[in-house]
Amino acid sequence: MTNELTPKFNPTEVEAGRYEKWLEADVFKPSGNPDAEPYSIVIPPPNVTGKLHLGHAWDTTLQDIIIRQKRMQGFDTLWLPGMDHAGIATQAKVAARLAEDGILPQDLGREKFLDKVWEWKDEYATTIKEQWGKMGISVDYSRERFTLDEGLSQAVRKVFVQLYNKGWIYRGEKLINWDPKAMTALSDIEVIHKEIDGAFYHITYQIEGSDEFVEIATTRPETFLGDTAVIVNEKDERYKHLVGKNVILPIINRVIPILTDDHADMEKGTGVVKITPAHDPNDFEVAMRHDLPMINMMNNDGTINENGGKYEGLDRFEARKQIVADLKELGQLVDIKPVRHEVGHSERTGVVVEPRLSTQWFVKMDELAKNAIANQTTEDAVEFYPPRFNDTFMQWMENVHDWVISRQLWWGHQIPAWYNEAGEMYVGEEAPEGEGWTQDEDVLDTWFSSALWPFSTMGWPDENSADFIRYFPTSTLVTGYDIIFFWVSRMIFQSLEFTGKSPFHNVLIHGLIRDEEGRKMSKSLGNGIDPMDVIEKYGADALRWFLSNGSAPGQDVRFSYDKMDAAWNFINKIWNVSRYILMNAEDISADAVSSALTKVANKTAGNVTDRWILTRLNDTVERVTEQMDKFEFGVAGHILYNFIWDEFANWYLELTKEVMFGEDEAEKDITRAVLLHVLDQVLRLLHPIMPFFTEEIFEKLPNTSGSIVVAEYPKVRPEFNDDKASEGVAMLIELITAVRNIRAEVNTPLSKAVPMLIKSEHADFLNAVSPYISRFTNPSELTIAKDLAVPEQAMSAVITGAELYLPLAGLINIEEEIARLEKELAKWQKELDLVNKKLGNERFVANAKAEVVQKEKDKLADYQEKFDTVKARIAELKEN
């Protein structure tokens, strides 16, 4: 294998075939080391409804970063993949595909239709796995699961039966949300409330046996077909004389009573409220209090049923138009007032949801919610990142309603209940013995099976399953904040109920991917981006870097092609640095690198810049690891970027040229070893985020072996820490930067040699590194002393530990130099004010770590010294 890298980074070439090699090498499976601490993640199963979008790419990237880092740190890692059958969404997709050929699901019948859905599932599961491969996600495919697998189906049946036997699952007639397009019930959290334009229709009902009328207002006039009463408040003097009387519903002429109930608000509208118990949740409660009949006036498809008289068969919105016209003709439509109001829409089909009386299966939530709330005060509490989402979770659990779990679909887990002609019902994990039993045709809400995902995928209900014992509870769940209600909370209460444990220790919540303008990506806006298109142009590593580097727990991310360009440029920079190092250090062995590093640590070889970069590497490893452990991938990315781009590439690499272009071969070998070691460690730090190109370079390093996937993650090596070297080279870099800035201000190019004077208590050190100063600043004459006469006409700069003077007689204007220094003085004054404010904050001083407070005090001393020196220099110039 050649150690050379191609002249230009080409992600297509680098990524081609790499994923397949990893799979062949089985590097994604658990290590099987019984002494290693287990670390497990179950993938939030994507729906088999279509291709993955950018949000999925973000979600899986974050999980892959975590699992790759933990694998490198020696954990026994399991990342379990799988997919969700997504009942209503998948059934709707397949039905739409069949409709293109003029076929309805009913034309095929249940079994043949389900055959079509399984074909769809197989097609899109293959597509999803191909996309996972393009993203480079390191899941263990030998443990892949699907929510309709037999093992998971067994878990679903067991949970249903046990909850039923406890009385926590029941079948009853209640008001539910109904999707007329999918023709199924929906839970409250599957309803999205959108603000739309509507109208208040003011209608009069005639008092029976009187010429008097009462006026009501409604946004849904068609529902009067199901009215069974009108109510007024008993304190409302306007209507006391009508209580106990009846009204006659217009058109259909049904007679209904006038009752009193606190639900009627005297201050709202006319104070008279129509009651439609079968189509309004508040009206349902009123009807329960007064034992009113409940009239369902709508079919499953949203058309008016036989209770609608002449409107039978009309679509609900068509019926509304006709009823409004008829009421107008009767003179009983008083007014129509436009209103902007929130209306529930189906999360899946987008149609307006109808509250509707229906017989369904429900989960009683009281006890399950109480257990979940109580658990958050124990050692087994789930830790949310960021912590504010714990409050979101708790609020939902404290206000939860019974969960409607039956769906009028074919695709899903069929409810394990059977009925016979005698009206008996049997609930069990298996069908009852004997003939004459028919299984309930409804299926369970998709989220019912998804709620069992963390433990059903590990072999439960077999609690002796090796994976269940080893990897459950899982370590971390990564998911978006939009499904805390749908999924996270349900996994928690189901896991507590059936395993006695939380399903995961940590939950990392991320936000949504938005476009550059901050808009949510959607089909209607046409601003969606296919991650595969991005990968084709930039490569998976660049996309992963963007997704992680812009990532903070709980925050949204704005996609930007400019940021993608920056990500690609960063990889290209590392590629070029690696290419340079490999060209100059291709023959050095791992033993030689280790020996050289030992000498540098012992200070028997190497120079101050070698010890500086190794110290800075230690600091980077420590800070990156700390941020990764907190899931602050964006912060970790910034630390890595600054170290790699600025300290390693822009400074150390350039500083090494003083050695590499010299004559001392022994010193060159030391420098080569340090370059290789730092590159090796950088690649390991980057690998969890950008796996493809880091593997490509890693396998070409002469001092490494095996795959970077299972290489050891960097650790701090205290023997490399050298504070003096760190401070010294920091001063050197600050000095070189200051000279370059001064030259730029007076348009003096680096090619033009000018004299330089440096006054410093660290003159001995600066003289020792003077070859570097000369190489990077090109002085015609370099004077470094602890004390020296300051030239009158000179540009000056104050850096940490030194004063710098460039005599540029004839090139500078004293007034302009004073003005420049006064700007610098203002800068240091601002820095002093900020530090003084922080140190003046008693809470900060009392609560911050001692080393943090000391760091601020050190800053204060440094800034004060610079302020005083600049101020003195201004005074000198003004005197002259």
Swiss-Prot record:
From the UniProt record, list the coiled-coil ranges.
808-880
Placement of sequence motif 'HIGH' region = 46-56
| UniProt keyword NADP present | no
Look up the domain of life of the source. Answer: Bacteria
| UniProt motif 'KMSKS' region: location | 520-524
Q: A Gene Ontology MF term for this entry?
A: ATP binding
InterPro entries xrefs = aa-tRNA-synth_I_CS, aa-tRNA-synth_Ia, Anticodon_Ia_Val, M/V/L/I-tRNA-synth_anticd-bd, Rossmann-like_a/b/a_fold, tRNA-bd_arm, tRNAsynth_Ia_anticodon-bd, Val-tRNA_synth_C_sf
Q: Which residues bind ATP?
A: 523
- ATP-binding as a keyword of this entry, yes or no, is yes
User: Single GO cellular component annotation?
Assistant: cytosol
Compartments in which it is found? Cytoplasm
> EC?
6.1.1.9
* Gene Ontology annotations of biological process type: valyl-tRNA aminoacylation
The record ties this protein, via PROSITE patterns, to: AA_TRNA_LIGASE_I (PS00178)
Question: So what does this thing catalyse?
Answer: tRNA(Val) + L-valine + ATP = L-valyl-tRNA(Val) + AMP + diphosphate
Question: Mainly resides where?
Answer: cytoplasm
Query: What keywords appear on the UniProt entry?
Result: Aminoacyl-tRNA synthetase, ATP-binding, Coiled coil, Cytoplasm, Ligase, Nucleotide-binding, Protein biosynthesis
Complex and partners = Monomer.
The family assignment reads:
Belongs to the class-I aminoacyl-tRNA synthetase family. ValS type 1 subfamily.
**Entry text on domains:** ValRS has two distinct active sites: one for aminoacylation and one for editing. The misactivated threonine is translocated from the active site to the editing site.
Biological function: Catalyzes the attachment of valine to tRNA(Val). As ValRS can inadvertently accommodate and process structurally similar amino acids such as threonine, to avoid such errors, it has a 'posttransfer' editing activity that hydrolyzes mischarged Thr-tRNA(Val) in a tRNA-dependent manner.
Q: What is this protein called?
A: Valine--tRNA ligase
Organism per entry: Lactococcus lactis subsp. lactis (strain IL1403) (Streptococcus lactis)
